[in-house]
């Protein structure tokens, strides 16, 4: 961990300057939205507890500020290839049939390329849903 000049701690997990809270937003944004809604507070508490135990205390307010701001990165990355992905699924008459937690994501008999596209759509659904929920829960507007 490297102390920054502003109130954040940096984690070089991905050889970049994403802060710790942003990394956790990244780690959790593919979780099932209902699961994250239910368990987010306990997950955050555990992360802060572990960092404190390891000698790197982070205040919950600082964590939440960086966490909610970090959702912007996931929102942008999630939408980056979305038009091409959805256009492809639409041209195959699949877009209209997608459902949350689509069982086709784990259909071993489906063409692997098509299954990958359906999984991509599900991951993007989770990304947008989780990011919007986090933004609402932790007052993104005020943090921004």
Predicted features along the sequence, with ranges:
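Active-site acidic catalytic loop and adjacent metal/ATP-binding pocket
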Residues: 1-20
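Alpha-helical, largely C-terminal catalytic domains
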Residues: 6, 30, 70
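Active-site activation/catalytic loop segments of kinase-like enzymes and analogous catalytic loops
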Residues: 14-56, 73-100
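Charged/polar, solvent-exposed surface patches and flexible loops
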Residues: 26, 49, 65, 69, ...
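Helix N-terminus capping/helix-initiation residues
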Residues: 32-33, 59, 120-121
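Generic alpha-helical secondary structure signal
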Residues: 38-42, 61, 122
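All-alpha amphipathic helical-bundle segments outside canonical DNA-binding/catalytic cores
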Residues: 57-74, 116
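ATP/Mg2+ or Mg2+-diphosphate-binding catalytic cores
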Residues: 75-144
């Amino acid at each position: 961990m490297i102390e920054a000049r502003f109130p954040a701690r940096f984690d070089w997990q991905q050889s970049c300057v994403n802060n710790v809270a942003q990394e956790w937003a990244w780690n959790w944004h593919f979780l099932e939205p209902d699961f994250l809604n239910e368990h987010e507070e306990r997950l955050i508490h555990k992360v802060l507890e572990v960092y404190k135990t390891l000698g790197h205390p982070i205040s919950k307010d600082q964590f939440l500020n960086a966490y909610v701001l970090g959702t912007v990165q996931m929102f942008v990355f999630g939408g980056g290839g979305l038009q091409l992905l959805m256009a492809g699924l639409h041209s195959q008459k699949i877009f209209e049939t997608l459902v949350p937690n689509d069982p086709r994501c784990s259909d071993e008999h489906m063409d692997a390329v098509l299954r990958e596209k359906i999984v991509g759509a599900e991951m993007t659904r989770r990304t947008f849903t989780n990011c919007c929920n986090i933004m609402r829960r932790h007052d993104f507007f005020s943090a921004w």
